[in-house]
């Protein structure tokens, strides 16, 4: 019996998240990508399932990133706080939906403050 190697698989959330920067008159926008690392076939099926529920994931992420501070958006440590919150929040959502919480990584792939 040969074990299949783990495969990284990504899903770029097709939404630009926008809102107010906490304590300022500024607005922000950011984009998010999530990833899993599991055996190839499972990885493919998992990302396919996430893609089918992407609208729900957008709703969850929107609530998770409300009113970030400028420091959170501009610093490496702050962006890590945001991505950790997204990672934990989405996995908790998947558990509530009866799915395995297999999102291993969350990334902010674009940030703008105006």
Segments predicted by a language model, with ranges:
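Flexible, low-complexity charged segments
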Residues: 1-114
């Amino acid at each position: 019996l040969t074990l299949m190697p783990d495969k990284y698989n990504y899903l770029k959330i097709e939404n630009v998240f926008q809102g107010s920067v906490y304590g300022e008159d500024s607005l922000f926008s950011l984009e998010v990508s999530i990833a899993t690392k599991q055996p190839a076939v499972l990885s493919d099926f998992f990302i396919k399932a996430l893609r089918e529920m992407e609208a729900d994931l957008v709703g969850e992420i929107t609530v998770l990133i409300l009113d970030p501070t400028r420091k959170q958006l501009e610093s490496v440590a702050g962006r890590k706080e945001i991505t950790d919150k997204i990672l934990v929040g989405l996995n908790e959502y998947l558990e509530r939906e009866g799915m395995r919480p297999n999102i291993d990584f969350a990334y902010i792939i674009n940030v703008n403050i105006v």
